[in-house]
């Protein structure tokens, strides 16, 4: 046993220090990034925000809606091959280039993902997703996926430390997904005592990944557009959002009515709700590590997408970054004990 003495920080612990800027307008900011990935050799351009691969966020409807904003969607793994075929038949090539195919690590997951990828060559992203990316089995699956799909861009996670980030990249991942426990409906930290404050995890993993020519996704912990800006400022190449995109018409959650008001259910993928829906319940040997919440209906996702992108552009103007690519170089974080004036928050 040992204790690391240096303090680790989350998004709520910092603000971005403003700097002199020559930008005249938020409209001058370029949010689109262009990437060429280490192993696949594929190039991609777009806004590097990703709708999370949760079945109450990462839906086909969400992918179609967010593609118009140049935003990616990691489509959840619970769609059948037939449902994928129907989606592909009704989608343009532009929508498909903004789609990630999500998978677990079982043999059945591998075979199903292979069938989905064979449906259309425009499906270039594979998202290999488990709660704990530290197992040897997971690393072996990433290597197996790289061998099977040498030209596909593979993202893999989740991890929170530099050495594991490096191992996944060396095993074949182009992008590593970073985050254990920061999500709005994740209870891993309180059920297990395991986790890592998200901003510090992003900073550490970005440094490790970029040294090897890899990239990272900051997954979880964002509650406002300002948090998205902080994640990019900390070195994230992509930012994945779950709760911020939940509760919309495209989100796919079940709608319930209570006292005449309608709500949409949103739950973590290790919650009792998710496990009952997909595997029949919580196994005797494990605990649920997610919760279920009822969200007021939020309408179409386009309004939220515009709000996020507008906040990100504004953050860039405050530090003089004419492109999103420059934001991390222009970012200085200051540690704080307050984020906002909350006097009217309950009104």
Swiss-Prot record:
<feature type="binding site">
    <location>
        <position position="183"/>
    </location>
    <ligand>
        <name>K(+)</name>
    </ligand>
</feature>
<dbReference type="InterPro" id="IPR013785">
    <property type="entry name" value="Aldolase_TIM"/>
</dbReference>
<keyword id="KW-0560">Oxidoreductase</keyword>
<dbReference type="InterPro" id="IPR015875">
    <property type="entry name" value="IMP_DH/GMP_Rdtase_CS"/>
</dbReference>
<comment type="function">
    <text>Catalyzes the irreversible NADPH-dependent deamination of GMP to IMP. It functions in the conversion of nucleobase, nucleoside and nucleotide derivatives of G to A nucleotides, and in maintaining the intracellular balance of A and G nucleotides.</text>
</comment>
<dbReference type="GO" id="GO:0003920">
    <property type="term" value="F:GMP reductase activity"/>
</dbReference>
<dbReference type="InterPro" id="IPR005993">
    <property type="entry name" value="GMPR"/>
</dbReference>
<feature type="binding site">
    <location>
        <position position="181"/>
    </location>
    <ligand>
        <name>K(+)</name>
    </ligand>
</feature>
<dbReference type="GO" id="GO:0006163">
    <property type="term" value="P:purine nucleotide metabolic process"/>
</dbReference>
<dbReference type="GO" id="GO:0046872">
    <property type="term" value="F:metal ion binding"/>
</dbReference>
<feature type="binding site">
    <location>
        <begin position="216"/>
        <end position="239"/>
    </location>
    <ligand>
        <name>NADP(+)</name>
    </ligand>
</feature>
<feature type="binding site">
    <location>
        <begin position="108"/>
        <end position="131"/>
    </location>
    <ligand>
        <name>NADP(+)</name>
    </ligand>
</feature>
<dbReference type="Pfam" id="PF00478">
    <property type="entry name" value="IMPDH"/>
</dbReference>
<dbReference type="InterPro" id="IPR001093">
    <property type="entry name" value="IMP_DH_GMPRt"/>
</dbReference>
<dbReference type="InterPro" id="IPR050139">
    <property type="entry name" value="GMP_reductase"/>
</dbReference>
<dbReference type="GO" id="GO:0005829">
    <property type="term" value="C:cytosol"/>
</dbReference>
<comment type="subunit">
    <text>Homotetramer.</text>
</comment>
<keyword id="KW-0479">Metal-binding</keyword>
<feature type="active site" description="Thioimidate intermediate">
    <location>
        <position position="186"/>
    </location>
</feature>
<keyword id="KW-0630">Potassium</keyword>
<comment type="similarity">
    <text>Belongs to the IMPDH/GMPR family. GuaC type 1 subfamily.</text>
</comment>
<dbReference type="GO" id="GO:1902560">
    <property type="term" value="C:GMP reductase complex"/>
</dbReference>
<protein>
    <recommendedName>
        <fullName>GMP reductase</fullName>
        <ecNumber>1.7.1.7</ecNumber>
    </recommendedName>
</protein>
<keyword id="KW-0521">NADP</keyword>
